[in-house]
């Protein structure tokens, strides 16, 4: 009996140890498969469905929405991530070349032997000259040779196996043709530009791009459309320098992956539609007319103020009025010498210009009831005579 009890206790202990080891393995497998949670979850559901007993009723399947938090990004996080990747990536000297095969090494060896055998003449075909502003990339049997680009100076290559490509490192100009752009205030215009760039990494350039000018042209057009969509027409016309700088920074962030350095971009011309030009011209003309009217009104106001001040001064000094009257007569005789001017006596002018006469509207003549005395009465003889 004791032996049977001991054996049963040993079996129970073994079963518990095996179950605990299985649980540990499942926990480890669960930790390792966290990255593959979604596909494994579907597989676990299928396995649990298969292992369920036939007699037990199945519970209704619960639907749930699984959201991967890592894939949810904000509107600005993607651009920030791209900029961070570009800043962290260092410019390489060239693409890592792949090694040559056995047959290729045999061909290289045979070519070297042939060059050595025909040394005096073959050397002229194996050496080339590279200018100071050029770099040469050599491909041997289609593989990029390790190391930096060759040049300036002499470089050696195998005529039968090697092909070389020269890359100009000088500043190059690319004219961007007119293309339509929609502004922030929904105006449609045509803009052309010019882009200045240079080749920085010849190996990376030849391995990345087939048509450099087309790639840069399309990139400039799409970048300008994207940036100018956030600016109004007035900003585009007045802030060309800042817009060109923004376009240059955006282009340089992309072309550095191709081994190209964008030095400068400029907006050459802005072409507006005919209807928009007419409306802008009408608006500008109306503004000019309004300014002219304001200036004329201000001039008339200043002239009236001057005349009022002059009238006040002349009314206070009668001698000044007389001098002004004489000056006017002199100017009339000077301008029109054939005209005869008969001046009125100054006393009559002062009488006409007096405030009382202006109020009455006429000169006070003597009344008709009294006899009018003659101006030159005849002297009567004295009674003594």
Swiss-Prot record:
Subunit structure, as described in the record: Interacts with nephrin/NPHS1, KIRRL1 and CD2AP. Interacts with DDN.
Lipid tethering residues (S-palmitoyl cysteine): 103
Single biological process term from Gene Ontology: actin cytoskeleton organization
Spans annotated as Disordered: 1-64, 357-385
Gene Ontology terms: cellular component: cell periphery; cytoplasmic side of plasma membrane; membrane raft; plasma membrane; protein-containing complex; slit diaphragm
Source organism of the structure: Mus musculus
Encoding gene (name): Nphs2
Coiled-coil residue spans: none
Protein name as it appears in the record: Podocin
PANTHER family (alphabetical): BAND 7 PROTEIN-RELATED (PTHR10264), PODOCIN (PTHR10264:SF127)
Residue numbers on the Extracellular membrane side: 126-385
Pfam families assigned to the protein according to its UniProt record, in alphabetical order: Band_7
Gene3D superfamilies, sorted: 6.10.250.2090, Band 7 domain
């Amino acid at each position: 009996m004791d032996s049977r009890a001991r054996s049963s206790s040993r079996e129970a202990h073994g079963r518990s140890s095996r179950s605990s080891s299985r649980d540990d393995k499942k926990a480890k497998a669960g930790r390792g498969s966290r990255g593959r949670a979604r596909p494994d979850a579907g597989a676990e559901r299928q396995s649990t469905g298969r292992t369920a007993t036939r007699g037990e009723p199945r519970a209704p399947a619960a639907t749930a929405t699984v959201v991967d938090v890592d894939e949810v990004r904000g509107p600005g996080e993607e651009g920030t991530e791209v900029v961070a990747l570009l800043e962290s990536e260092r410019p390489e000297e060239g693409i890592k070349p792949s090694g040559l095969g056995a047959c290729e090494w045999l061909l290289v060896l045979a070519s070297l032997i042939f060059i050595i055998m025909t040394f005096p003449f073959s050397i002229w075909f194996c050496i080339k000259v590279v200018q100071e502003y050029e770099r040469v990339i050599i491909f041997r049997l289609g593989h990029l040779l390790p190391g930096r680009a060759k040049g300036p100076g002499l470089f050696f290559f195998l005529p039968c196996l090697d092909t070389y490509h020269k890359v100009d490192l000088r500043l190059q100009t690319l004219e961007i043709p007119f293309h339509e752009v929609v502004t922030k205030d929904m105006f449609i215009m045509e803009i052309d530009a010019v882009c200045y760039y240079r080749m920085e990494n010849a190996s990376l350039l030849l391995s990345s791009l087939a048509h450099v000018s087309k790639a840069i042209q399309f990139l400039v057009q799409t970048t300008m459309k994207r940036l100018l969509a956030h600016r109004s027409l007035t900003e585009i016309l007045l802030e060309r320098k800042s817009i060109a700088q923004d376009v240059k920074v955006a282009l340089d962030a992309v072309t550095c992956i191709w081994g190209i350095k964008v030095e400068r971009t400029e907006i050459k011309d802005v072409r507006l539609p005919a209807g928009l030009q007419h409306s802008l011209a009408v608006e500008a003309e109306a503004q000019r007319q309004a300014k002219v009217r304001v200036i004329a009104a201000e001039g008339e106001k200043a002239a009236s103020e001057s005349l009022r001040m002059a009238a006040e001064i002349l009314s206070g000094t009668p001698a000044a009025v007389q001098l002004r009257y004489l000056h006017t007569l002199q100017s009339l005789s000077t301008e029109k010498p054939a005209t005869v001017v008969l001046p009125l006596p100054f006393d009559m002018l002062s009488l006409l210009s007096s405030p009382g006469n202006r109020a009455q509207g006429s000169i006070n003549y003597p009344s008709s009831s009294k006899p009018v005395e003659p101006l030159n009465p005849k002297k009567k003889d004295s009674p003594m005579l």
